[in-house]
Regions:
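Short, flexible turn/loop "capping" segments at secondary-structure junctions
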Residues: 80-82, 126, 169-170
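All-alpha effector-binding/dimerization core of bacterial HTH-type transcriptional repressors
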Residues: 76, 89-140, 144-151, 176-188
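Short linear motifs at protein or domain termini
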Residues: 1-113, 209
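Short, hydrophobic secondary-structure boundary micro-motifs
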Residues: 46-48, 82, 142-146, 189-190
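A short secondary-structure junction motif
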Residues: 38, 42, 152-156, 203, ...
Length: 209
């Protein structure tokens, strides 16, 4: 499972052409992680139709782990199932990622209002802060929703955005969020949350990460 492959276009797929190599992946990377990254990076384009057999053949694995991966990807909002039991990559329309991150911002703001000593997370990594927030949520539906946003979209963005200046700015906004939450200055906290998530939205909408 070193390589994942792609089609340049749906026309190529219909002509029976094999997917193109996307690049070598670590063997320990799961199928769902490989496919998720390829979709978010736009290596597998929006509206591309996929089958279990095609993916399994190209990744040189059995269909069972592919089937399980596709179930997860559907739950994560990256693919949709078709009547013929194939799947299709969702169409990331303008504002798609903004809506996801705005929901994350809303939920994190509500949870931070309920947390004790949020400033104690200051020494944690950026991703660890987000994980700590959803783990401290007492509403199971909110927690699972925010977990999905964190582990799919935030994790991917934090891992792949290479601009060090932007990374530093984003982390500074997050630290200010925790400081204002600690002081119970919730209006200021939400202002910093807005700035933080706006940075992430901007990067995703460029679709260059």
């Amino acid at each position: 499972m070193d390589t994942i492959l792609k089609w340049k276009s749906d026309t190529d797929r219909k002509k029976g052409k094999r997917m193109e190599p996307l690049g070598v992946k670590k063997k320990q990377g799961s199928i769902v992680e490989i496919l998720r990254d390829a979709i978010l990076h736009n290596d597998i384009e929006c509206d591309t139709e996929l089958t279990q057999k095609e993916i399994a053949d190209n990744l040189e694995v059995s269909r069972m782990p592919v089937r399980e991966a596709l179930i997860l990807l559907e739950y994560q909002g990256l693919i949709r199932r078709l009547p013929n039991n194939h799947v299709k990559v969702v169409n990331f329309t303008k504002g798609y990622f903004a809506e996801i991150f705005q929901l994350g911002m809303l939920l994190e703001g509500k949870i931070l209002r309920q947390m004790e000593k949020p400033e104690t997370m200051m020494q944690q990594s950026e991703l660890s802060v987000h994980r700590e927030i959803y783990r401290n949520c007492h509403n199971q539906l909110w927690s699972k929703t925010l977990e999905s946003i964190t582990e799919i979209y935030l994790e991917y963005g934090i891992r792949n955005i290479q601009n060090q200046e932007e990374n530093k700015e984003r982390e500074e906004f997050l630290h200010k969020v925790l400081k204002e939450a600690e002081k119970k200055e919730y209006a200021k906290m939400e202002e910093q949350l807005q700035k933080y998530f706006s940075c992430m939205i901007h990067e995703f909408e460029k679709r260059e990460i």
